Design a protein with these regions (language model features):
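Sec/Tat-exported extracytoplasmic proteins
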Residues: 62, 91, 115, 119, ...
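Low-complexity, compositionally biased segments
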Residues: 72, 80-82, 93, 103, ...
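Extended non-globular C-terminal regions
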Residues: 111-237, 241, 245-265
Length: 438
């Protein structure tokens, strides 16, 4: 707020031959209102094999954590501001600002080491991170913390003067966000053969878009600050064999999933007294395109261009040929306003939104829209004609619907992505008293 005061001055000795001058003063006062908030999706179920494959793929090494390890990491929270402070000690930047640390390039191992020494972390969780750190030291990926954390106006403060701001983040979310940032948008090839029960083989190609540095999934800022999840493309090729319903023929299920980033915008902060406040956040979930078909992965990581998806050979043998394709979309782009009271903020309560047409069972939804071309190449093959073949194929695919759904769900959630949904939480709000700044 800028205030300009003008008053008529007083003169004494010169009052007989001149008029009194006008005297003015200008002052500017500022009242800063900020909040710490994040967007993402918390893992509700865990698959040890998928998690190890994906994290290992991002790091370019082999990860062998146990299910209990992941459960501990998912359950743990940490103050990201304290992570920066721990890293500042390691980097000998304690006399600098938070921005100095955020902009310094570090290895993934250095990040994990700082995470283990962060104030408030449970010893059991720190031990898990130390185990992962030994593996990460074999990786050569590097990152800058500004790629996963935006501290806004707090960036210019000296290390240790963060005024106990609660920038709460999940430990699992942080280590995965750092792995994605360090990977630099490279395309990943994952072989999940032994990890998904009931499927002969599973191969996946994954590409993760790089969000602008100013909009990571965790931030501190005032009205208008934006956080986003990663834009993600996933092509999965599932093979099921030995299925008697269609004469023991091998069935190929190629799936393509593209999820746009979910976005949360700090819409308003209303101060309620005593430094407390209520925060409004506008959220748009990550909409998706899901297809059954062959996706061209040659330029998968180029998010400026849509990959071509063509009809796929679901069954290809000397006896029978079945080609098919399907496409579904979750396309609701309506903003949803979430309001966080002071009680919600104190408890770091997670609130969720979803599209009106959320895809809850991806594969079964695709099968309802499946277009098939069936060619019976061996006339004596008795499958009851075209209707019988369609029924046999439907029964075969129904068997693998649940494990493939679980596969897609887990791979995307590791990246903080849930199709058509988003989880948001506000963990601190500051309503500072007006102060003269000029």
């Amino acid at each position: 707020v800028k205030v300009n005061i003008v008053e008529k001055g007083q003169i004494f000795f010169a009052a007989a031959f001149t008029t009194p001058p006008k005297v003015s003063a200008v002052g500017t006062a500022s009242s800063q209102k900020i909040a710490a908030f994040s967007v993402g999706s918390r893992l509700a179920s865990l698959d040890e094999g998928i998690l190890n494959s994906l994290l290992g793929g991002l790091l370019g090494t082999t990860v062998s954590l146990k299910l209990m390890d992941y459960q501990g990491l998912v359950a743990a929270d940490v103050n990201a501001l304290h992570v920066v402070e721990a890293l500042a000690i390691d980097l000998k930047l304690t006399a600098g600002t938070y921005k100095d640390v955020l902009k310094t390039e570090i290895t993934y191992g250095q990040f994990l080491n700082a995470l283990t020494k962060t104030t408030g972390l449970q010893p059991a969780v720190a031990n898990i991170l130390k185990t992962l750190e030994k593996t990460a030291n074999k990786s050569n990926i590097k990152l800058k913390l500004e790629e996963i954390l935006n501290l806004g106006p707090s960036s210019d403060k000296l290390i240790g003067s963060g005024e106990n701001l609660k920038v709460t983040a999940g430990v699992f979310d942080l280590l995965n966000a750092a792995a994605v940032a360090g990977n630099g948008g490279n395309q990943l090839a994952l072989n999940l053969n032994a990890n998904v029960l009931g499927l002969a083989s599973v191969k996946a190609t994954l590409a993760i878009g790089e969000p602008p540095i100013e909009t990571p999934s965790l931030a501190v800022g005032g009205q208008g600050t934006i956080v986003r999840t990663a834009q993600t493309r996933l092509a999965v090729n599932v093979v099921v064999d030995g299925l008697q319903a269609i004469a023991g023929l091998k069935v190929n299920i190629p799936l393509y999933v593209e999820v746009a980033h979910a976005e949360a915008r700090l819409a308003d902060i209303r101060c309620t007294g005593g430094g407390q406040g209520t925060v409004d956040v506008e959220v748009v979930p990550g909409v998706a395109e899901i297809a059954l078909g062959n996706a061209d992965t040659s330029a998968f990581a180029n998010f400026g261009k849509d990959p071509r998806v063509t009809k796929a050979a679901i069954v290809d043998s000397a006896l029978l040929a079945i080609n098919g394709s399907a496409l579904i979309n979750a396309t609701n782009m309506t903003k949803t306003k979430l309001t966080f009271t002071q009680s919600d903020i104190t408890q770091a309560k997670i609130k969720s939104i979803s599209t009106k047409d959320t895809v809850t069972t991806l594969v079964s939804s695709l099968l309802k829209n499946l277009n098939l071309d069936i060619r019976l190449l061996f006339l004596n093959l008795d499958l009851g004609g075209l209707a019988g073949i369609q029924a046999a194929l439907a029964n075969t695919l129904a068997v693998v619907t649940a494990p493939v759904d679980q596969l897609l769900y887990n791979v995307l959630l590791v990246l903080g992505v849930k199709i058509g949904e988003a989880d948001v939480r506000v963990t601190d709000v500051r309503c500072q008293q007006p102060a003269l700044v000029q």
